[in-house]
Structure formats: structure tokens, C-alpha cells
Amino acid sequence: ENQTEEKTQYNLFDKGACVVSDNGVLKLINKDNQSLLSDELTIVSRVGDAVIVKQNGLYGMVNSKGQITVSPQYISLETMVPGKLYVYQVHGNNGMPAFGLVDGNGTIKTIPLYEEFRPYKTQDGILVKAYDSMGKQGLFNEEGEVVMQPLYQVTEPSKIKGLYNITDNLKKGVIGADYKVRVKPDYDDVRILVREDTFFVATSGLKSIVSKRVTQKIFETEGLILDIFKQSDGSICFVVEQDLFYGVCTSEGKWLIEPQYDEVLGIVAGKMCVRKG
């Protein structure tokens, strides 16, 4: 007796169409209570301003006007970025499942070359991690555009826009959005420090190397580099930890402050506040 009321309140689209449940069957109707789908299509779920449908065991997508945007042709169709991006599945050449990306308009964003996709949250939104059959990771944005090709075993955005942390054989490095390698993946750890200029601090064992580009090593020390700052004359200095003590060294390797302090409390205007004992 409340069926009409339920139909007008259940899963309403902005333009007046809505998904309703009629005896357990989902239907897409307009504001005049007319069905917008043919009987051959079964609604599986609503995604954004569309519905995922099934026909003869294959999945596709229909928008809120009843127009087929993704024809039913995929083994599965799953939401990756709601309302924007979806993962489709087909049979690969070897008979194994293969996955690609398609947007809500049915535009194929990537052919089915991948074994898996996962959303990856960042400060600027969602990136999509793509895993290929060679064990490499690529990155796509919310619209399905390529951010980074799958070149390394791990590829993740750094905190600096346009730079990406990479890992190969458990060794870390950095690559730019222009695909130029800033630090080869040869190190135990790599940090990016922005201090007027951008510095890359690579650590291997107890040795630290500072570079500005892949071929421009500006400092190397047996110790861990905590911070970098410039003196008033423009020369670059490094806060270094050696044997659990802290000091300051120039890029020429000269100690301005021998490593003798227990803690560095902060650096202000080129001056270091330290604690001893």
C-alpha cells in the first residue's frame, strides 16, 4: 500500500529518475513512473548518476536517462572512484582474468593489461594503483588518466607534487612526473627535503648522500642527515647524527660543530638550538 511512496523516495537521481524495488526487482523509472530500461537488463546496483546492469551474465552501465553508456560485455564491473571510474574484467589471452579502467561514459581509459586496481588516497584526492603481471605498479588519476607508467615494483606519490617514491628489489629511489629519475632505486631510504632548493637525502646503511639531481652529489657522510640549512653567505650546512650525537657539517666536509650534542631542538635563521646532557 505504500509502494508508490517508496518508489518516489528510493534512490532518487537529480533529474527526477530513481531506482525502485518492485517485488525485489530493481527498476529505473522516471518521474512519471515509466520504466527507462528494457526487460533484458537487470539492475545490479546504483553508482553515481548511473546504474550497473547485467545481461546474459555480462555487466554494463546505464545512465539515469536510461541510455546505455557501457554495453553489457564484461565479466564484472566494479566501482573504483564513485561516479567517475570503474574496473572492468575480461578473459585475458592466457585465460586468466584481466582488468582495465572505464569511465561512466563508457570510454575505455586503459585496455585490460592489469591484474588488479586499488584506490590510493592522497592529499590531492584519489589515485588508482595498477598492478601488472610483471609485478610492477602504475598510477592513474580519478579520471583514469595515466600518472605514472608501471616501471617499478612500488610507485607512490611523495609529499612533493610531481615527485614519486619508487622501490625496486627493496631499494628505494625517486622519479619525477617527467619520468626523469632523481635518485636511482639503490638505497635503503630516500627523503625529500625542500629548503629553498629541493634536496634528496639517500641513506644506505650508515652512509648518507645528498644530491640535487641524479648526477649531482653535493655531500656524503658516515652518519644520518637530519636537516639542511643555508648560512648567511649562501653556503649549505647539514645537521648530522653520528654515534647518537649531533653536529653541523659543511658541504666541504668541515665540522662547524663537532657531533657532541644529545639533541637538536630546532634551527632558526641558521642557528641551532641544542641540548647536551
Question: Which sequence ranges carry the predicted segments?
Answer:
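Residue-level detector of conserved, function-critical positions
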Residues: 1-277
